[in-house]
Swiss-Prot record:
This is Cytochrome b5 domain-containing protein RLF. GO terms for biological process: lateral root formation. Keywords: Cytoplasm, Growth regulation, Heme, Iron, Metal-binding. The gene is RLF. Coiled coil: none annotated. One of its GO terms (molecular function) is metal ion binding. The lineage of its organism: Eukaryota, Viridiplantae, Streptophyta, Embryophyta, Tracheophyta. Widely expressed. Involved in the control of lateral root (LR) formation. Acts a positive regulator of early cell divisions involved in LR initiation, independently of ARF7 and ARF19-mediated auxin signaling. Residues 1-10, 47-58 have a biased composition (Basic and acidic residues). It is found in: Cytoplasm, Cytosol. InterPro entries: Cyt_B5-like_heme/steroid-bd, Cyt_B5-like_heme/steroid_sf, Cyt_B5_heme-BS, Cytochrome_b5/Flavoprotein_Rdt.
Length: 211
């Protein structure tokens, strides 16, 4: 038996059809190659992201893998928006809520209708009042304070004060000008407490008492 023909292997080159060669050449010619380092920098090393599903593409007899980077960009943008620090809200100063019937409009109505808010009982509101007398009026319906050289009975205004009664009590029986200017420098006290005017501070006696 002749076995020489079984071991004789002959290889011959088989050329693809001309049409397939032309298509393959045109498809390969349209592929653009870019620098790998620049691609990694621009895409944030997206090729290392295993979560992106690869796609198999075939051009003629040439097959290769394509990775979609658009989803990775969306995820990075969404994550950056998620971790943005929220802007701080400005801190506002809270006011003490007034009781019904004690708004500033209610106070304005009262000053127009009440005959004697200062409690003068017929006395003049232009008389000179020493500081010693101011200190004696600290309770009840007669609470005096000095504002910009004038003496006022602020007892009727207590419940109308936007800052509360406790804050206004700090000025009772003393000169409250500094405290008033600290919080209400823009307020015209001559108009606000016009009907509460008791008199004018006698600053001559105050100066004599100073060392």
């Amino acid at each position: 038996m002749d076995t020489s023909r079984d071991d004789d292997f002959t290889f011959s080159k088989v050329s693809p059809p001309d049409s397939e060669v032309k298509d393959l050449a045109s498809d390969v010619g349209s592929i653009t190659l870019k620098d790998g380092l620049d691609q990694q920098k621009s895409n944030g090393l997206i090729w290392k992201d295993k979560s992106l599903p690869p796609k198999e593409e075939t051009i003629g007899s040439l097959s290769f893998t394509v990775t979609d980077s658009s989803s990775s960009k969306k995820q990075s943008n969404e994550s950056s928006e998620t971790f943005k620090t929220p802007a701080r809200k400005p801190i506002t100063r809270t006011k003490v809520p007034f009781e019904k019937g004690y708004s500033q409009m209610d106070w304005l109505k009262l000053t127009r209708t009440h005959p004697d808010l200062a409690g003068l009982k017929g006395e003049s509101n232009k008389r000179l009042i020493p500081m010693d007398e101011v200190k004696k009026h600290r309770t009840g319906d007669s609470m005096w304070t000095v504002l910009k050289g004038r003496v006022y009975n602020i007892s009727p205004y207590m419940n109308f004060h936007p800052g509360g009664v406790d804050m206004l009590m700090k000025a009772v029986g003393r000169d409250g000008t500094l405290l008033f200017n600290k919080y209400h420098a823009w307020v015209n006290v001559d108009i606000l407490l016009e009907k509460c005017l008791v008199g004018v501070l006698d600053d001559t006696k105050v100066k004599k008492q100073e060392p």
